[in-house]
Every structure is written in C-alpha cells, then in structure tokens.
A protein has these predicted regions:
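The feature captures the LRR N-terminal capping module
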Residues: 1-214, 223-224, 229-247
C-alpha cells in the first residue's frame, strides 16, 4: 500500500517535471490549431498589454489573432513571423504600426480597425499580396503613396477616420471591389474614381459631399453606391439614368 503511494508521487513529479521542461514558446505553441490547412493562433480577449516575447519564436504561424486586447505597441520582432497570411489587431490601443510590418511579404489580410492610428508606415506598401485591409475607426487623415503598390487589394475599409479627400494611392488599387469611406470629412469625389474599374460597392455615407463627379458613370460594375447623410444638391443627369445603384 505504501509502495503504491510512493509510486504515484514519483509519477506526479515526473509529470510536473515534464511540464516545467517545456519552453514558454512551446507552451504557447500548444494552443496553435490547424484550420483549413493553416497554423492558427488566437490570443484574442486575453487582456494583453504586451505581446508575449515567446510569440515571436513561433515562426510557423500563418494566422494570428491579437484582437480585443490592450496592446499599445507592436515590437519590431513582428518581422520574424514571415509566414503570416492573416494578422488581426482590431480593438487594441495601437497608435502606430512598426515599419517592420513591411517584411510580412505573404500577408493577405490585415485588420487594424478600432485602434488609435494617426499614420500608416510607408513600408506597408511592400506587402503586395494584401487583398483585404481594414483601417476603420482610427485617426487617419492620409495614407502613404507607397500603398499604390497594393495592386491586389480587393477590399479597403477607411471608414470613421479624418479623411478630407480620398488618398491618391487608392486610385492605383485597380483590383478594388469594395471601398468603405463612410464617416470621414469628404467634400468631393475626384474624377480619378473612374480608375477603379472593378468597384462593386462604394460607401461614402456620413460625409460632406455636395456633388458627384460624372466619372462615377464609368464604374460599370458598380452595384451599390451609398450616399446617405451627405449634402448632395447637384446630381448629373447621367447618374439619374443609372439610379438603380444609388442607395
């Protein structure tokens, strides 16, 4: 009877010793799941004020969710996660993104909405595989010209920022099908809008638009144009003829 008890104690010690021998990175690694063929890790809603240092050792990560925490800074170590395809940072307190984000050359989806960004690093333009980018609910008044390189971008959300005009780089994003600019400070839409030939959804509600450019009629793929809560007094006759896409 006593021998059996002694054996149990030894087993317990061996078990706990194995746990202690794991590196911190390995402990986090156990939370990685395989989802649709991707290595996915979610640390959402963990009350994180800083990213655990060990996270930057998980080079195999392809999808990382750090949303709904209290992160104020992302360190340059982000560049180590060069296999990232999806990075979710929404609902934090980030005032900037590290320039090293430009080294994530495989990145296709980036969510940074509901943060405190006042600018976007030029280096983001190096992430030329990006297809979805949400920068909504920040404090942005412009975007760097380097984002003209995001020619594969299909969905761009810039709503709830401080944009007085559509950033020039947007007109080079020829693959855009969805452009959300609601609740900014836009007073007009430039004729350059006609460059976005693939655009299907354009949302500009809640701005200060007074008129519409004739160039909008060149967007033959447009299915939804939301102009609610503006001050539009001048609508070209050509728009009336295509009023089926106006919301």
């Amino acid at each position: 009877m006593g021998g059996a008890g002694c054996k149990e104690v030894k087993e317990e010690k061996r078990s706990s010793g194995g746990e202690d021998s794991l590196s911190s990175a390995d402990r986090i690694r156990r939370f990685i799941i395989k989802q649709f063929g991707y290595n996915v890790l979610s640390l959402a809603r963990r009350g994180l004020k800083d990213v655990p240092e060990e996270l930057w050792e998980l080079l195999e990560l392809e999808k990382l969710n750090l949303s709904l925490n209290s992160l104020k800074v992302l360190p340059p170590h982000l560049a180590r996660l060069s296999n990232l395809v999806v990075l979710n940072l929404w609902g934090n307190q980030l005032s900037s993104l590290p320039s090293e984000i430009g080294q994530l050359r495989r990145l296709r989806v980036l969510f940074v909405y509901r943060n405190r960004l006042t600018e976007v690093p030029e280096e983001l333009g190096a992430c030329t595989q990006l297809e979805v980018l949400s920068l909504a609910n920040n404090q942005l008044s412009s975007l760097p010209a380097s984002l003209s390189n995001l020619t594969r971008l299909r969905k761009l959300n810039l709503s709830h920022n401080h944009m007085a005009h559509i950033p020039g780089c947007v007109y080079n994003m020829k693959a855009l099908v969805f452009l959300h600019l609601a609740c900014n400070h836009l007073e007009n839409l430039a004729e350059n809008i006609q460059a976005l030939v693939e655009l299907k959804i354009l949302i500009v509600e809640g701005n200060s638009l007074h008129s519409l450019p004739k160039a909008l009629c060149c967007l033959t793929r447009l299915e939804l144009l939301n102009l609610d809560f503006n001050d539009i007094k001048d609508v070209p006759q050509s728009h009336i003829l295509r009023s089926q896409f106006v919301s």
